[in-house]
Each structure stands twice: as C-alpha cells, then as structure tokens.
C-alpha cells in the first residue's frame, strides 16, 4: 500500500478491541517514530508506553479518551533538548507531532489503529506516571485493533480541496489568490 493510500485509509479510532498489540508490532511503530525528522536533529521526543492493567487504569484518570485501547503512548518532548530559535519558541511541539504522525502511519500499515488525543490532563499525567517537569506533554495516542463496531466518523472523508487550503506566492483572496483549481 502506498503512503498516500495509508493516509487516505487511516482514521481516528474510537472503538478499540481489547486484543493486545504484539510486541513486534509495537516495536516497529516505535521505531518508525525514531525515524522522524526533528529540528536540528535534536530528537527531543520522549514516548511513554502505557499498557499494563494498572497503568491503563491510571491513564483513565488522565483522559476520558482512551476508548478501550490496550496501549496508550504519551507523546512528550524534553524542553531542555528541543531546538530553540529566538523567533520560534516551540520546535518541540512540531517535532513530537511529526514523530506521532510517523508512528500513526506505521501502525496503520500494520493493521493497528490509533487516535491523536489532545483532551488530556497534563498535571495528572505527571502525577500518575512520574513525568519530569522538563518534559512537555503534548498528547496521548491510544493504539490497538479496531472493534467489530469500528467505523470512520461521518466527517472522515469530508476534506477541503487544495483549492481552499493551498495558495501560491501570497494569501490573497478571490480570483487572484493563485490557489489550485483542483
């Protein structure tokens, strides 16, 4: 399957099966994240794998959006490691987003579904999992196999065309915008 097909087929899973994700697949997903480019190649990502019953019960105190997944990745970055620039203060958030996207696509290729979840309680995550203060927690990513009731949201295929989201040479509006006619 092409990367474009993976992107088109992947959807945010909100109905997971309790079936465990095999260690080999989990390792492949994590390895894909390690391939992600990061600003100045600093690699500030710090991924916590949450999968034991007690740890998942702790996760349920930190988000209501685990959706029954047997694995949850905490996506964070070390603020002392992330690249810095005077005009751009948060390269780490972009870095961890790219890492998360790489892992999400690798999971999809392996038949493992995922969901990017930003509805989290970072202070509670810190308390429950001993996350250092120097780590900025950006999101969690539940991983697992889809349940029999799994379906993409009705909004999944509703995408604005590039003619509405891509501009050439300026962000001017109207007929002179230079937007694609796709």
PLM-predicted stretches and their roles:
Residues 1-182:
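Acidic, surface-exposed loops and disordered segments
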